[in-house]
């Protein structure tokens, strides 16, 4: 019989082993059933007709950071992903609404049929959300690949832009005035990035998005493929929307965390992993996971330039609440509209210790408003806790 001492806190990432398996329970099932006990112990058990003790899995999860993230998200729906960009270690994975794995057998029928909360859905890996302005890292990368520089771009933001009878507004109709590329990114200017997107075109944006694993498989056991619909035939209004993270694009928080990990790790995405080590019943190490590179998503120079853009977001832009700390942060906020009334999910992606990145955080708060309102304070609590330890 399983006992989950943390109850709901790790419910999705650790998973369950009743009514099928999910999460780490599924990934580590064979390992937990396998025994590397000392051979004399196995002979003794065979003689006594007793079972050998299965191996123990040591996860990469950080219980303290998980608790901080879990409590910071509170009663709101959403997800938090925290990773170590240089290794691929998955340190935190929170998804809410959640469930108690200790009582999942008793509550199974209710949980399976609960379409309102979808508590069994791991929003961190399998949630599908419009990325909002976090997608501007993709648009920015495509611009750099096409132009070779961010210098020389100038735009006069008047609070809205209309092309082919389609109008896009900046958040709260803010008029940003004269901007270069860096200030447009820091201000999260929708008008400038809609203008940039139209200049790039659907085919170019699609190529760069797919380089960053949109419409592609991810190096995970369980995930939802992120979708990106632009192509060479896409109409201008859809390109405008897509370039600012709206349109038909859908992405998981984990996928945005992986893109951020690549930016923080000189362009290389390390293969994410949950199992740090396997030990036998005597505590001897059976297998230790060694970090391995999964794929280079961008050049070192491209990653460095995106990092500079994201640093400016914290220094003088929409994530300025994270500035002035004992450590540095680079990030991007997002407000992803999801209905006709203009309600939006609150996004943040970013990393700390900019010169030698140590921690990547991705946060989404459903119906949380702007990124700076809900997601940034959660990320701040996680960064603070990590750097205080």
Model-found features: residue ranges?
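Short, intrinsically disordered, mixed-charge
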Residues: 33, 74, 311-315, 384, ...
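Short hydrophobic alpha-helical segments used for membrane anchoring or interfacial signaling
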Residues: 80-85
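Extracytoplasmic/periplasmic proteins that interact with beta-lactams or build/remodel peptidoglycan
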Residues: 1-79, 93-123, 128, 293, ...
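Short, gly/Ser/Thr-rich active-site loops of penicillin-recognizing serine hydrolases
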Residues: 285-292, 378-389
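Intrinsically disordered, low-complexity acidic/polar segments
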Residues: 22, 358, 370-372
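Short, charged, low-complexity patches
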Residues: 256, 371-380
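Beta-lactam-recognizing serine transpeptidase/beta-lactamase-like catalytic domain environment
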Residues: 86-133, 138-367
């Amino acid at each position: 019989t399983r006992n989950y001492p943390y109850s709901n806190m790790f419910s999705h990432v650790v998973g369950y082993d009743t009514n099928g398996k999910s999460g780490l329970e599924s990934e580590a099932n064979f390992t937990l059933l396998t025994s590397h006990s000392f051979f004399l112990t196995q002979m003794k058990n065979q003689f006594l007709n007793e079972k050998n003790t299965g191996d123990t899995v040591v996860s990469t999860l950080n219980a303290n950071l998980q608790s901080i993230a879990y409590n910071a998200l509170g009663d709101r729906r959403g997800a938090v992903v925290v990773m170590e960009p240089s290794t691929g270690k998955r340190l935190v994975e929170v998804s809410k609404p959640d469930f108690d794995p200790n009582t999942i057998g008793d509550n199974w029928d209710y949980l399976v049929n609960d379409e309102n909360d979808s508590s069994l859905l791991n929003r961190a890996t399998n949630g599908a959300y419009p990325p909002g302005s976090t997608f501007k890292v993709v648009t920015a990368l495509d611009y750099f690949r096409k132009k070779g520089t961010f210098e020389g771009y100038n735009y006069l933001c008047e609070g809205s832009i209309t092309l082919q009878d389609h109008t896009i507004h900046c958040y709260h109709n803010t008029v940003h005035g004269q901007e270069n590329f860096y200030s447009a990114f820091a201000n999260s200017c929708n008008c400038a990035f809609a203008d940039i997107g139209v200049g790039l075109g659907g085919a170019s944006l699609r190529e760069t998005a797919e380089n960053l694993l949109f419409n592609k498989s991810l190096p995970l056991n369980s995930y939802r493929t992120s979708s990106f619909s632009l192509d060479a035939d896409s109409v201008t209004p859809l390109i405008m929307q897509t370039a600012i993270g709206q349109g038909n694009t859908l992405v998981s928080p984990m996928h945005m965390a992986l893109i951020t990990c690549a930016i923080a790790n000189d362009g290389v995405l390390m293969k994410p992993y949950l199992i740090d080590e396997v030990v036998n019943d005597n505590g001897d190490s059976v297998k230790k996971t060694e970090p391995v590179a999964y794929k280079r998503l961008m050049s070192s120079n491209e990653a460095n330039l995106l990092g500079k853009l994201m640093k400016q977001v914290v220094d003088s832009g929409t994530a300025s609440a994270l500035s002035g700390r004992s450590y540095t942060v680079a990030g991007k906020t997002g407000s992803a509209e999801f209905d006709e009334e203009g309600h939006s999910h609150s996004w943040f992606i970013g990393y700390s210790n900019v010169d030698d990145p140590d921690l990547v955080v991705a946060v989404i708060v459903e119906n949380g408003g702007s990124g700076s309102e809900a997601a940034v304070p959660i990320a701040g609590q996680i960064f603070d806790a990590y750097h205080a330890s």
